[in-house]
């Protein structure tokens, strides 16, 4: 009976035991459950995470990491455990960009990459690199041989010095003994005389023993004198050998110094030639030769595209004409003749609209997407441009400051994008893994010569300027999570266009169009009504560890140091978005000569304090 009661109690208590082991669930805004398990059941927790990761794969894409961290911190569970969820996703893309190690292991892939990018003219760089690497290796082998020879000579000198000291000690000891023996010889005659005077037989025997001992010592002294001569000869030979070895060692040191200088110069040449090679493309990048080969991923608000063949929109004014119309038209006239082609000025409400756009973009990225706002320098060193991949390929597109001006003893340039300034803030840095990702947003003027694109329809107005405004986004991540944050950055850039209600499309660039430092690149193109085409307003690139290797930017996890991955994108190009707003938000005109009025987008009205901008004619 007692046993049956125990069994009955176990049956009742078993469900409570099972429920106590179930996860605690917290519901987030996206109706996705984040599961946080009791810390005591660590082993069971890991197995459960692996299984739930497959079921709830959307969790990674829908839940913001900072939100996860906030929840986990409230429940006394470290954010690193939530990061483990991200890290366990399968990464199909490459984790490594172009590097010297990659080149040595996969020279054929580097050749294929150049051909895929249409950069066959750089194949001679590969030949040069192989030659330089072989030459460097030969020099290193020769240097190592000389070092080994120097070590052998050093050990030989030590042995010679040790032996010399040994012989010197023997000589010093023999000299001391000789002086004692001479004293003994002086007393021999005295001892003989004493024996003659003594009549005691026992005393005579003792004296004879002393005489025999003294004679024996005298014989030893004569032998020591001969040994001293031999030791002196050995010492002389050792000194000669030591001098010869020192001369040889000095020559070896000079040869090693010369070889090491050659190795340093070869490394610089290898590095310079390696800089000419672009990043390795990911497999998903389509092959192509022209922009027509780009892959269109999706459209947004395609139905809102304004078609000029529609009678309602016959009187849309191009933005390049609008920016020439100022309220204070009696002050400004013939501006283009005074400032040159490729430059624009904005006055009053249009200038305010540009500032409103910048503020809206920065506030959105800082407040909604939790970026850190950084105002970075607009003048950088030459090496900074090498680190991010603008040099050596795009030197003719950069504005170089006069040779008389130096920055950190280097040539100085105006930045083509604030990406250069932001990333170089982390040069030679090691970041703790728990601080990743680092998300930065910056607004700056950007300077480009645009030598090949300064004329024609596609370069009018705000579409292509020598100086333009841009909001830049930078993510520094670890190698496992860069694809995840890359997708997020693209969504963050497109969010701005969605808030402005501007039609756009997302385009995956083909192998020819993909930027030099990128492994993959998506362009965000918005609709420009006056030209009836999409124009690029953002270019989002994942550079993998390509830039981080040049910057020597690493993150530390446990006992290992790995190169970071860098992601960049515009969030957005201010001038082009402004041009689209000036056309997209025009209030319909009944006739061509009617005053142009522009409706301010809803999200910008709080910055402008007005709903409509009126543009007057000159």
Swiss-Prot record:
It catalyses: tRNA(Ser) + L-serine + ATP = L-seryl-tRNA(Ser) + AMP + diphosphate + H(+); tRNA(Sec) + L-serine + ATP = L-seryl-tRNA(Sec) + AMP + diphosphate + H(+). Keywords: Aminoacyl-tRNA synthetase, ATP-binding, Cytoplasm, Ligase, Merozoite, Nucleotide-binding, Protein biosynthesis. Pfam families: tRNA-synt_2b. GO terms for biological process: cytoplasmic translation; seryl-tRNA aminoacylation. Possible candidate for an effective malaria vaccine as determined by epitope response in sera. PROSITE patterns: AA_TRNA_LIGASE_II. It is found in: Cytoplasm. The keyword Repeat does not apply. Its main location: cytoplasm. ATP binds at residues 448-450, 536-539. Catalyzes the attachment of serine to tRNA(Ser). Is also able to aminoacylate tRNA(Sec) with serine, to form the misacylated tRNA L-seryl-tRNA(Sec), which will be further converted into selenocysteinyl-tRNA(Sec). Belongs to the class-II aminoacyl-tRNA synthetase family. Type-1 seryl-tRNA synthetase subfamily. Consists of two distinct domains, a catalytic core and a N-terminal extension that is involved in tRNA binding. This is Serine--tRNA ligase, cytoplasmic. It comes from Plasmodium falciparum (isolate 3D7).
């Amino acid at each position: 009976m007692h046993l049956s009661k125990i069994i009955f109690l176990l049956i009742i208590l078993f469900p409570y035991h099972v429920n106590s082991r179930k996860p605690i669930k917290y519901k987030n805004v996206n109706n996705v459950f984040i599961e946080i398990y009791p810390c005591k059941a660590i082993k069971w927790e890991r197995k459960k995470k692996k299984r739930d990761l497959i079921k709830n794969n959307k969790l990674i894409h829908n839940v913001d990491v900072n939100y996860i961290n906030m929840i986990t911190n409230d429940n006394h569970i470290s954010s690193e455990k939530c990061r483990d969820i991200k890290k366990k996703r399968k990464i199909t893309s490459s984790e490594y960009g172009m590097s010297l190690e990659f080149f040595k292991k996969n020279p054929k892939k580097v050749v294929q990459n150049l051909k895929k990018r249409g950069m066959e003219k750089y194949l001679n760089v590969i030949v040069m690199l192989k030659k330089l690497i072989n030459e460097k290796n030969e020099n290193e082998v020769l240097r190592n041989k000389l070092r080994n020879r120097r070590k052998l000579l050093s050990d030989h000198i030590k042995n010679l010095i040790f032996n010399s000291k040994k012989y010197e000690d023997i000589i010093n000891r023999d000299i001391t003994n000789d002086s004692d023996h001479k004293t003994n010889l002086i007393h021999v005659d005295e001892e003989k005389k004493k024996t003659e005077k003594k009549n005691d037989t026992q005393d005579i025997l003792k004296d004879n023993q002393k005489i025999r001992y003294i004679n024996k010592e005298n014989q030893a002294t004569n032998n020591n004198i001969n040994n001293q001569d031999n030791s002196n000869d050995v010492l002389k030979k050792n000194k000669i050998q030591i001098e010869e070895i020192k001369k040889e060692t000095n020559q070896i040191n000079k040869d090693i110094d010369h070889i090491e200088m050659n190795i340093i110069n070869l490394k610089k040449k290898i590095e310079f030639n390696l800089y000419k090679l672009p990043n390795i493309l990911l497999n998903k990048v389509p092959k192509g030769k022209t922009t027509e080969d780009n892959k269109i991923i999706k459209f947004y608000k395609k139905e809102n595209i304004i078609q000029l063949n529609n009678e309602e929109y016959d009187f849309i004014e191009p933005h390049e004409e609008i920016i020439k119309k100022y309220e204070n038209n009696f002050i400004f006239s013939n501006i283009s003749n005074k400032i040159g082609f490729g430059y624009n000025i904005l006055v009053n409400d249009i200038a305010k609209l540009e500032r409103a756009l910048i503020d809206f973009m920065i506030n959105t990225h800082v407040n909604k997407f939790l970026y850190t706002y950084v105002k970075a320098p607009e003048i950088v060193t030459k090496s900074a441009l090498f680190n991010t991949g603008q040099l050596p390929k795009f030197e003719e597109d950069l504005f170089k400051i006069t040779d008389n001006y130096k920055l950190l003893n280097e040539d100085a340039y105006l930045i083509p994008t604030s990406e250069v300034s932001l990333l170089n803030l982390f040069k030679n840095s090691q970041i703790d893994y728990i601080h990743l990702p680092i998300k930065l947003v910056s607004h700056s003027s950007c300077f480009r010569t645009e030598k090949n694109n300064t004329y024609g329809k596609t370069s009018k107005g705000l579409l292509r300027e020598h100086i333009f405004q841009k909001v830049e986004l930078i993510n520094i991540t670890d190698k496992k999570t860069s694809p995840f944050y890359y997708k997020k950055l693209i969504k963050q850039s497109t969010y701005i266009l969605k808030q402005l209600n501007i039609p756009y499309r997302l385009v995956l660039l083909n192998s020819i169009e993909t930027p030099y430092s990128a492994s993959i690149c998506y362009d965000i193109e918005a609709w420009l009504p006056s030209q009836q085409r999409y124009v690029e307003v953002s270019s989002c690139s994942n550079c993998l560890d390509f830039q981080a290797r040049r910057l020597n930017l690493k993150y530390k996890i446990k006992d290992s140091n790995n190169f970071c991955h860098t992601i960049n994108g515009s969030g957005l190009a201010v001038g082009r978005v402004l041009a689209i707003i000036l056309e997209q938000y025009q209030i319909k005109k009944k006739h061509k000569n009617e005053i142009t009025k522009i409706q301010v987008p809803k999200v910008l009205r709080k910055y402008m304090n007005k709903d409509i901008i009126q543009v007057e004619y000159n």
